[in-house]
């Protein structure tokens, strides 16, 4: 959420770009690089969903466009037939979605049953193996913004394989992207605690966090650099995750391209 790093707060650190910024970057990418002309929106009627929706609205406005049609739903809704029919009638060619995993899967499944081949664009909350590996190949044509790509258990890097084995041994399932990023976040905090040493104070911990420069996690995320005026961990460049279906295998997220954040020209500044 934008509230994690805007405005600046000396005891807040943000790991990723906000949902708002992710959607702005994604919409800009698809309009400019994929020639999308009719942008629509589907979103949860929650603070989260409205933040995603705001990103889509502000980006199309910045490009002298408008949202052609939109629908909202409760997180508990299960029937999306009418909503999708409305968007189909509006001739949308890109649907920006403020959804998570469960409602994303139901929306994609419904669209496939309708025979509607349209591009859906999600954000970090929908960048999950639960979408990519959903039965029936429903994830084909769905894209999500993400700070980096998920590292699968068969990744050639020994450190990733070791993490995946330990994770599955403890929890009984392979790690998803949220699991990987949670581990990466913990490693950054541990690094700062080590540098702050045993006589820990708030000031020493903040100084240690702000002194992290160019740290790379084991998953290949962009380098993490912070400072006394910038508590936003990752570079504002975003990877746009697409998805493909290899023959005889489950769905996997694949890189589509990179898009700069549309609304964040630089780090938030500490107030005087």
Segments predicted by a language model, with ranges:
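Hydrophobic alpha-helical segments within soluble ligand-binding/sensing domains
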Residues: 15-38, 79-81, 104, 130, ...
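Acidic, proline/serine/threonine- and glycine-rich low-complexity intrinsically disordered segments
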Residues: 232, 236-268, 272
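Beta-alpha junction/loop-to-helix N-cap segments that form part of ligand/metal-binding clefts
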Residues: 1-5, 73-80, 100-105
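Extracellular/periplasmic periplasmic-binding protein-like sensory domains
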Residues: 9, 108-183, 194-196, 200, ...
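Sec-exported extracytoplasmic/periplasmic mature domains
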Residues: 28-36, 57-65, 85-92, 109-116, ...
